[in-house]
């Protein structure tokens, strides 16, 4: 009986200790919109690599869950002419994810064409990546 309580106590401690780390990813990604808006490619690279290393997730795993003023990260970069950050985000995404419709049912390419961003540096990087 004592062993059962001991194992249960250890399991509860492990669960309590691991809970804060799940919430930390949100804190780590809290300022990513500002980083993209400021076109800070170096800081963006650090942020993405930190999240990848600490939480074992890739950009494509959390990309759809982040919105900046109602836009995804790449759309946000296009809207603010954050060319270096936008091109970096495109290089980090899988081609298949770049072709997926986003929340409004449009792909990044369709949205960029409709909003006049396809001819800019980020649009060019997108077209090059999509082949």
Regions found by a protein language model. Give the residues of each.
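Bacterial N-terminal signal peptides that target proteins for export
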Residues: 1-9
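Long, amphipathic, charge-rich alpha-helical segments that form helical bundles/coiled-coils
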Residues: 74-80
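Conserved hydrophobic residue in the first alpha-helix
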Residues: 32, 73-74, 108-109
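Ankyrin repeat arrays, specifically the small/polar loop and inter-repeat linker segments at the C-terminal end
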Residues: 24-29, 41-68, 80-84, 88-131
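N-terminal signal peptide c-region/cleavage motif recognized by signal peptidases
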Residues: 18-22
